[in-house]
Amino acid sequence: MASSRRPCRQLHQPRCGGPARPGSGARKFAFVFLPDFPAFSERMATEQPQMTLDPVVTLTAIARETERIGLVATSSTTFNEPYNLARQFKALDVVSHGRAGWNAVTTSDPAAAANYGQAVAERPERYGRAHEMLQVVEALWGSWGQDAWLKDKASGRFVDVSKVQPVNLQGQHVASRGHLPIPPSEQGQPVVFSAGGGQYGLTIAGRHASGVIGAAFTIEDARAQREAAREAAQEAGRDADDVKYFAGLMLGVGEDARDVLNRRLAYASDHLPSRLPYLGGMLGLELRSERIDEPLTPQELADARPSPFDPRSERALEVAREGWTLREVLVHGVIDYHPTPIGSPETIADHLQEWFEAGACDGFWLSPDVHDQDIDVFVDEVLPILRERGL
């Protein structure tokens, strides 16, 4: 879900729907975003399964029950063919009356590659294929002229075929020759998002994306990523404002931080001991699972050295110095890849305001602890605070 400084291109008529309770979030969220992982995860043995259903199919079901909210699905450019992706997303766009978006990503996971009977390609090859995929998919989407779809029952003419141009593209990795037999939706074609980092990902975002699904833990990192995406758009001959950067936020809303921590402990406590070595690596300490319900000793706090290669490490040490047990440090979300503010609605609003006013993002995508509860609280209690502050 997201709010933004300006609506994304193609989402110029924001289709924002109610997230949890019918009507509670109408016109408050620009889109719902589904990630994807096309492989079996060993974590399913002890944790709730996630990302097991095809996101396009899932969002098609959601489209039937909603009217305004945008529907953004993740699909890989590595293990799909352009015609299939163009057809699937154009169908979702038509079914939803112009609310579809494609988060175009490359895939480097060996388990996912094995499912498709392939090996993991080198990064330049993966992104070379991604560029070709996006060019072909967008060409297929754009093959219909806006006035090609006649729908004239009286004359019996439904399509002006002279205004449907065939695609004839041949690249090093993919190709397509022919027509996509699906007319434009109300928004024309699906919106393209990007979630890749580094120079390869920036090039994709600059040339093709209207939105970037960001992954930054600090304001400084987010601001740098946002500026890099804007510069990439300009280098591709586009306006910098054509690309919107959405910072991720894994929030927990409650009466206070203790209330949220208790809830997280109830849901996730069994999985935390296995993550203790990772926390130790971030702090330069050897941490054993039998000490998970103890805080760091004064000597350990003095010896701790946050990893200079991990921006989350400083936050982890900051939380540990507050006297929390190691289990509680972990449920603060210090090893998550996005900021994890917890506490009262005012605390969450403060975080959003600080990032937004610092120029770290154009909007946010939110992943709450408990969707049924936190989305309603966010809409009913956090958003009014932001409105009062003129945000």
Report the location of each language-model feature.
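Hydrophobic or amphipathic alpha-helical targeting/insertion segments
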Residues: 65-66, 70-115, 121-133
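Hydrophobic faces of well-ordered beta-strands that scaffold small-molecule active sites
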Residues: 32-34, 69-75, 98-104, 190-195, ...
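Conserved, mostly hydrophobic/aromatic
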Residues: 28, 62, 92, 102, ...
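Active-site mouth loops of central-metabolism enzymes
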Residues: 2-15, 74-83, 119, 186-199, ...
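Catalytic domains of carbohydrate-active enzymes, especially glycoside hydrolases
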Residues: 12-36, 204-214, 352-362
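N-terminal beta1-alpha1-beta2 module of alpha/beta enzyme domains
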Residues: 1-65, 187-190, 300, 304
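Acidic (Asp/Glu)-rich catalytic clusters
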Residues: 25-26, 59-67, 93-99, 234-240, ...
